[in-house]
Regions:
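Conserved alpha-helical scaffold segments that buttress catalytic/binding sites
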Residues: 2-248
Length: 248
């Protein structure tokens, strides 16, 4: 899988530090020498790229993320984006939508997040409303699934209900993880898939390094199970991992 570091932040000052997480993740990955099946991992073979951004110029940063993401979708079979905060997912998601439209494929997005990120949009997308802006930019709302919600603002609840956005709460997920994974895979069946994962889907006991931790999340083992199931989806085109903040 091709890996792209996207050190973009627009958390209104609340996510400063997330721009460094891509390098921190790669550094940690290079210290892993085998997986739990005993297979050797050669980190020197990682296929890496970074989109160089100036976070003081949000409009330019978003254009660069979009342009580079679209090129990646057109040239790579599968890609992992390392944020950055969740604002990057607007530009990568918009590029994914345009790629699918040009290739006559049906786009699908599954978002793992404790928050809905559907507040009223600002001029440039932030980590609090990127998904709503993406929907209002044309991403088919019936093809979006929000998984793991456990702290949602009233305005967001109204938006989700009015637009009939499909959701699976954290209670749904933890009560029967295997069955919910089956539901998730069925939702993605036959569609080109983008998976966006906010690290706060995890319980802060397992992943404290994020700006908006929410108790009652998933364990690291549960997240690994999710990822292992999701990567088997043949139409999986892209994933992102966002909101890790090494300063926390």
């Amino acid at each position: 899988m091709f890996i792209v570091k996207v050190p973009g932040i627009n958390g209104l000052g609340k996510t400063k530090g997330c721009e460094k997480s891509g390098n921190a993740i790669i550094k940690a990955l290079r210290e892993i020498h085998s997986n739990e099946q005993g297979n050797i991992i050669d980190s020197s073979l990682l296929d890496l790229e970074e989109i160089h951004l100036d976070n003081s110029n949000l409009e330019l940063s978003n254009r660069l993320i979009y342009k580079n993401s679209l090129e990646t979708f057109n040239t790579k079979p599968r890609v992992l984006f390392l944020g950055g905060d969740h604002s990057i997912s607007y530009s990568t998601g918009k590029a994914f939508l345009d790629y699918c439209n040009s290739e006559k494929k049906e786009p699908c997005m599954i978002v793992f997040d404790s928050h809905a990120d559907c507040m009223p949009p600002m001029r440039e997308p932030t980590h609090e409303e990127w998904l709503r802006k993406l929907i209002e930019s044309g991403f088919p709302k019936e093809n979006i699934l929000l998984v793991g919600l456990r702290n949602v603002w009233k305005e967001e609840i109204n938006f989700l209900r009015e637009n009939k956005i499909k959701t699976l709460s954290i209670a749904n997920l933890t009560n029967d993880l295997q069955d919910m994974c089956d539901t998730i895979m069925e939702f993605a069946n036959g569609r080109e898939l983008y998976v966006s994962m906010d690290i706060d889907i995890a319980d802060p006991v397992f992943a404290p390094a994020t700006g908006y931790p929410e108790s009652g999340g998933l364990s690291s083992r549960q997240i690994l199970y999710l990822i292992q199931r999701i990567k088997k989806i043949k139409t999986l085109k892209a994933m992102d991992l966002v909101e890790i903040n090494e300063k926390k």
